[in-house]
Amino acid sequence: MAKLSLINRDIKRAKLADKYAAKRAELKAIIDDQSKTDEERYQARLKLQQLPRNANPTRQRNRCVVTGRPRGVFRKFGLTRHKLREMAMKGEIPGITKASW
């Protein structure tokens, strides 16, 4: 089990990213728009830099929903390889069977 402080930090980052997603998208659209003046684009870049660092979605870490482990997480299931295998062997994940050929 990962430390609760690290799990809570990632949850906090996810909430912050959701809160500022529209504002970030708006500013990035202005920055990428070639029809805007250089001054407008520069001001948009400064405003983007003023947003909280943790509002950037790339600072989030995929974690296992059961254990909070940050490595070896399968996106489709949200589980680490350990818990995925364990739950698949118990039959707790529908549609997953052990391979045999």
Swiss-Prot record:
- State the Gene Ontology terms under molecular function: rRNA binding; structural constituent of ribosome
One Pfam family matching this protein: Ribosomal_S14
Question: A Gene Ontology CC term for this entry?
Answer: cytoplasm
Cysteine pairings via disulfide bonds: none
GO biological process terms, semicolon-separated: translation
InterPro entries assigned to the protein according to its UniProt record, in alphabetical order? Ribosomal_uS14 (IPR001209), Ribosomal_uS14_bac/plastid (IPR023036)
Q: Where is the signal peptide?
A: none
Give the record's keywords alphabetically.
Ribonucleoprotein, Ribosomal protein, RNA-binding, rRNA-binding
What family classification does the UniProt entry report for this protein? Belongs to the universal ribosomal protein uS14 family.
Role, per record: Binds 16S rRNA, required for the assembly of 30S particles and may also be responsible for determining the conformation of the 16S rRNA at the A site.
Question: What is said about its interaction partners and assembly?
Answer: Part of the 30S ribosomal subunit. Contacts proteins S3 and S10.
The protein in question is named Small ribosomal subunit protein uS14
- Originating organism: Bordetella petrii (strain ATCC BAA-461 / DSM 12804 / CCUG 43448)
